């Protein structure tokens, strides 16, 4: 379980996060959503101590992260962040094996079990064919899958992900998020795509200008009356055949959808990015 209460943070004296709260119960997938600059990534970074909040508390399974040693924290939290291309001058195998470091002693060498876990993680994200490549030579989407594999190899009890679907095509966007749900690991994930959030998250936290606007179930948060003032765009909520909510988006400059004929270009779905 991850519990954050009253979390605030400022950059150069400018508040970017104010009294944010978040609860991710055991096995839940909680999505952080909101426009660019709303504080999603800042909140996520405080959860794994990449940023120290000016105020507030963060607990993982009831223990304050401030009292946990780095190695212990790495066993509890696996993180997928948006890393610069080519930052890791390693092979794909070595990159994924980094996820096993929290489980090794100071002088302990990697075992066959560690190697098998890393290989399985690559297979889970559809990247087993990249095993002999250099990480720096991969495309953006390939790098993203390898970084997700590294987090999976860590076998932590909690997973934190910042835009894990970046650079991925539609197929792998759904494959990766479906995999995350199947893992049953407590997960907090930053997502821009609201329809992906609707399909794969158990609950959502909506941020805007550094504050939590609302949080709750998919049905609670993904309502036009809630989202339109935040995103500044017209929304229509539909329901897919499997019962999952789906949102259609239109610019506020366009007339109300009822004034258009079916098949017009204004009826084409556009994702909020």
Question: Residue locations for each model-derived region?
Answer:
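ABC ATPase nucleotide-binding domains
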Residues: 228-273
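The feature captures the beta-strand-to-loop junction immediately N-terminal to the Walker
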Residues: 33-35
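Conserved ABC ATPase "signature" region
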Residues: 97, 112-130
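Conserved ABC ATPase signature
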Residues: 109, 134-138, 142
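Catalytic Walker B motif of ABC-type/P-loop ATPase nucleotide-binding domains
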Residues: 159-163, 168
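Helix-to-loop junction immediately C-terminal to a conserved catalytic motif
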Residues: 48
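Conserved ABC transporter NBD signature motif
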Residues: 56-64, 73
């Amino acid at each position: 379980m991850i519990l954050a209460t009253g979390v605030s943070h400022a950059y150069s004296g400018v508040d970017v996060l104010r009294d944010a709260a978040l609860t991710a119960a055991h096995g839940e997938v909680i999505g952080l959503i909101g426009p660019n600059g709303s504080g999603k990534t800042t909140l996520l970074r405080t959860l794994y101590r990449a940023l120290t909040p000016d105020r507030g508390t963060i607990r993982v399974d009831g223990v304050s992260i401030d009292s946990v040693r780095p190695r212990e924290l790495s066993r509890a939290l696996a993180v997928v962040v948006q890393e610069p291309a080519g930052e890791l001058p390693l092979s794909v195998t070595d990159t994924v094996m980094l996820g096993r470091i929290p489980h090794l002693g100071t002088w302990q060498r990697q075992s066959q079990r560690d190697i098998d876990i890393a290989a399985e993680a690559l297979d889970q994200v559809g990247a087993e064919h990249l095993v002999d490549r250099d990480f720096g030579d991969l495309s953006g989407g390939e790098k993203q899958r390898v970084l997700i594999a590294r987090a999976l190899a860590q076998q932590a009890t909690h997973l934190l992900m910042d835009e894990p679907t970046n650079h991925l095509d539609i197929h792998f966007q759904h494959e990766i998020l479906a995999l995350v749900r199947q893992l049953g690991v407590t997960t907090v994930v930053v997502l821009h795509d609201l329809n992906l959030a609707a399909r794969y998250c158990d609950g959502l936290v909506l941020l805007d200008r550094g504050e939590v606007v609302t949080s709750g179930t998919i049905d609670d948060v993904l309502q036009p009356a809630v989202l339109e003032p935040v995103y500044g765009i017209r929304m229509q909520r539909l329901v897919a055949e499997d019962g999952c909510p789906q949102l259609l988006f239109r610019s506020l400059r366009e007339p109300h959808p009822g004034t258009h004929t079916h098949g017009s270009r204004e009826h084409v779905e556009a994702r909020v990015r």
